[in-house]
Regions:
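Hydrophobic recognition helices of helix-based DNA-binding modules
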Residues: 52, 137, 156-163
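Hydrophobic, helix-rich cores of sensory/ligand-binding and other regulatory modules
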Residues: 69, 105-107, 125, 147-151
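All-alpha amphipathic helical-bundle segments outside canonical DNA-binding/catalytic cores
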Residues: 138-157
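Amphipathic, well-ordered alpha-helical segments in soluble domains
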Residues: 41-44, 125-132, 151, 155-158
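Generic protein-terminus/edge-of-domain signal
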Residues: 1-63
Length: 168
């Protein structure tokens, strides 16, 4: 377990971890995430298994590789198994509004755990988008904020294009 934590620290070292309007964070079992926040959040279960519980009482088991969205102000509890590790990307309402105002008026239904392995294509695209944003953080050049914003824009466009949205 100690070795795994060192690997995670190495993974996050060298990144700026926060850019204006969006940020990454690693979630571990011992550190609980807040039940709600004003940001849109996309979570990717990197290791282990977990459970997600929603305010309406729904509880879902999460296999490794699950990706799912937590909409703004949505109450949601995440429990990770002892060896669980999740990557969270939070995008502020202001950032979303500057890219896609339509997304602020919708609830994104991104829950890969509802689909079989042969139905993961659209979620693989979202996983790839998220990985590209994360990798962009490692680049150390003056255009980094521009590239990061373009990657976040691509992710938001893919969410709008490929996943069901409920207008609120």
């Amino acid at each position: 377990m100690e070795r795994d934590n060192r690997d995670e620290d190495i993974m996050m070292r060298g990144t700026k971890q926060e850019m204006p309007g969006f940020r990454f964070r690693l979630l571990r079992p011992e550190k609980k995430r807040e039940l709600w926040n004003p940001d849109f959040e996309l979570l990717f279960l990197l290791r282990g298994r977990g459970r997600v519980s929603y305010e309406d009482g729904e509880v879902h088991n999460l296999p490794m590789g699950s990706i799912f969205a937590i909409n703004r102000f949505q109450i949601c509890d995440l429990d990770l198994d002892e060896d669980g590790l999740a990557l969270s990307l939070c995008v502020s309402a202001e950032t979303i509004a500057s890219f896609h105002i339509k997304l602020l008026k919708c609830e994104v239904k991104c829950q890969s755990f509802f689909y079989m392995e042969d139905q993961q294509e659209k979620f693989d695209l979202i996983r790839r988008d998220m990985a590209r944003i994360f990798l962009e953080m490692y680049k150390n050049n003056e255009e980094q904020p521009i590239y990061m914003k373009s990657r976040v824009t691509a992710l938001l466009e893919d969410l709008l294009s490929y996943l069901s949205l409920i207008h609120i």
